[in-house]
Amino acid sequence: MADSPLEQGWNVVTWALSGSYDEDRPVLIDADQPNRSLSKKQAIDLVARLSGSFQPGSTVCVHLYNDIIYPVLVLAILASHCEWTGTNPAYTSAELSHHFAQSETRYVITDQAYVDVVHQAITASGQNIEIIIFSDIVTDKPGENDLRWRCNKYDLATLHSLLTHGDESTLRRRLQGIPNHSPATAMSTSGTTGLPKMVQRSHRSLVLETGGTQDHNSAKPFQVRRLYCTPIFHAFSFPEMVINTIRLGFPSFYMRRFDESFANKVHEFGITETMAAPAMLLKIIQWTEKHEEQRFKLQGLRTILCAGAALASRLRASFLQLFDDASVRIVQVWGMTEGGWFATFWYPEHDDTGSIGRPLPTCQIRVSEVPHAELPDGRQVGELLVKGPQLLTTYKGHPDATKQAFNDGWLRTGDIGYCANGKVYIIDRAKDIIKVNGWTISPAELEAVLHQMPVIVDAAALSYGTGTKEHVAMFVVAKEPSMLIADIKHHLLQQVARFKVATCEIHLVDSLPRNSSGKILRGVLRHQLQAHYGNGDHGID
C-alpha cells in the first residue's frame, strides 16, 4: 500500500486498513462488555465477509447506536462499491422518511427496537428499501434461526445472513475497482436553513481529512486510549471513530451513548483521550458536584476534543479546574458536515486565546472581503470561507443549493470570525447575529456574560421581532428557581453596553433544547415565543 494520504489512488477502506501495528491486539472495544472486542485482523475478516452484500451503486443506511460493529459495517458498505449514510436512532418516522428519500437509501441496517419506526418511514417514503436486522456477528455463532428475524409481521434478513466465505484477497480485488473520486458518504446537514440535505463526499475527501486530523501521537508522554460516546454518524465523530481508530491502532472503547457512567469508564479503562460537545462537559461538571469521587476518576484524561457548538471560556475554565494536572488540554475542532474538520490544534499546543484551531493542511481559510461587523478593538470580522479538496462533491439532488454554498470556489461557512497569527477565531453564526437599532450584537457574547454568574447553568440569546421591534430574547437555566430576572438584567447592564440589552426580554426555563451535537436549537425557542406573543412586535418596556 502507498504511504501517503495524498496518493491519488486511495479509497477509504484501503486507507483505514493501512496501519502497521499488532493486528491481533484488540482495537475496537465495547465499553459495556470489554470482553467483546475486535482486533484489526478480525475487523478485516468481517469486512471481507460482508463486502459484496449490497448492489453496487446503492446507498446503505446504518440506523444504529454506537457499536464496535459500526466501523466494520461502514467499511463493508464502501468495499461493496456503495455509499454509506447514517441516521440518529432517536429520529421519528417522518425524519427517517425524509432522510431515506434525500439519500436515495436502498438498504437500512437497524436494531429490532427500531424496526417499527423504520418500517413506517419506508412506507411513507414510497421507496423499495430492504431492512436488515442487526445481529451480533462479533460474539454470536450463527445458528439456522439467526439468519432470519421473524416477529409478528416481519421476516427479515440479519447481518449473519450476509456473511460469506470472502477473505482478504477477495477484499483487495474488490477495493482495486473503487475510484477515489466516487461517492463514499451522504451525511445529513443540521437543517438550520430548511429541511436537511444530504452532503455527498468522495473517498478522496475523507482520506485527505483523516490524514490531516492525525495528531502527533508518538510525541505524547502517555498511551493514547480513547473513549468514544459522541454520535458516530456525526461529522465530528465519524473520521476518528470509523476511520482513524482502526488505521492508527490505539485502543478505543465505544459507549452506546453518553451517560453518567462516563467517569467510571475513564477510570476503569485508563482512558487518556475522549471527544465531547460543550453540553457534555457541562454535564460532567454537574455530576462531579454531586459525586466527588467522579472527579477523582477523571484524572487520567489528558486530551478532550471538543466540537459541535461554541465552547464558552467560562465552561472551558470550569472543566479544566476538575483536574490536578495543568497539562490537560481541551482541543477545539471546527468544521462542517460539508467538509468535516477544518481547523484544530495538534499536540502539544495549548491555546487560551479563544481560537478554534489552525487550518488543516488540506484547508485554506480566509475572511470574506465584505466586513460583517467591527470588534471593540477595531478589528473587522466577516464570514469565514473555506477551500480545499476535502469539501463536499454536492448536496445530493440539490445542484442549485450546491452552487449557492460556494463563492468563487470558496465554501461559505456561515460563521463570522477572523484569522490572526495562523489561528482561526469565531465570533458567531451569521444567521444568529442580532441587529438592534442598527447595532450588531453577538448572541455568544451575551451568553458568555451570563455564564459569569455562578448561579447560571445554561443560557441562550436570540433575535426576536422585526424591524424597529427587533430585540434580544434570552432563555436562562438557573440553579436556583427563585433567581430574579432583575438580577440577571442588572448583571448584563454592568458587563455590556446598554444598547445591547436595554430592551432584552429574559425567560427562566428548566432546560434548553439542543441537537445531538449540543447546538442550541434557537428555532425551537423562537417558535415558543411566537406561540406566546405572535409575530414578536409586541414591544418591550
UniProtKB/Swiss-Prot annotation:
It is an enzyme of class 6 (ligase). InterPro entries: AMP-bd_C (IPR025110), AMP-bd_C_sf (IPR045851), AMP-dep_synth/lig_dom (IPR000873), ANL_N_sf (IPR042099). Keywords: ATP-binding, Ligase, Nucleotide-binding. GO terms for biological process: secondary metabolic process. The keyword Cytoplasm does not apply. Pfam families: AMP-binding, AMP-binding_C. This is Acyl-CoA ligase M9. It comes from Phoma sp. (strain ATCC 20986 / MF5453). The gene is M9.
